[in-house]
Amino acid sequence: MTTNPWSDPIRSFALRSFWDCYQALPEHVQKLADKQFRLFRQDPHHPSLGFSRKGEVWTAEVGGGYRALARQRGVDYYWFWIGSHEAYNKLLKRVK
């Protein structure tokens, strides 16, 4: 019997590169990121996440001024970066 991959729960993993970026963020942004990732695990399509695909990567909003990036493999998301919207715009040009 084949299982439907869309019925599997979404799994989310933060890579070392993500945690390196996270540690460099101001504490208030870290707290906001924590809140957003809890929400992502509950409902990845929640409007406040702004979760969308940009080429080969997925992006999520962390407040108005920050973004996080992930790559998808099956139903798993691997978060590899988080930072300012300005840095996101520059990085997105390279990873799309």
Task: Place the predicted regions along the sequence by residue.
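Enriched for short, Lys/Arg-rich terminal
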Residues: M1-F13, V62-K96
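Arg/Lys-rich, positively charged N-terminal/basic patches that mediate binding to nucleic acids
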Residues: M1-K35
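Amphipathic alpha-helical interface surfaces
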Residues: F18, V29, Q36, V62, ...
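Tryptophan-centered motif/residue detector
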Residues: W19, F37, W58, W79-W81
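Alpha-helix boundary/capping residues
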Residues: L25, Q36-F40, V95
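A short, surface-exposed loop/turn module that caps and links secondary-structure elements
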Residues: K35-V62
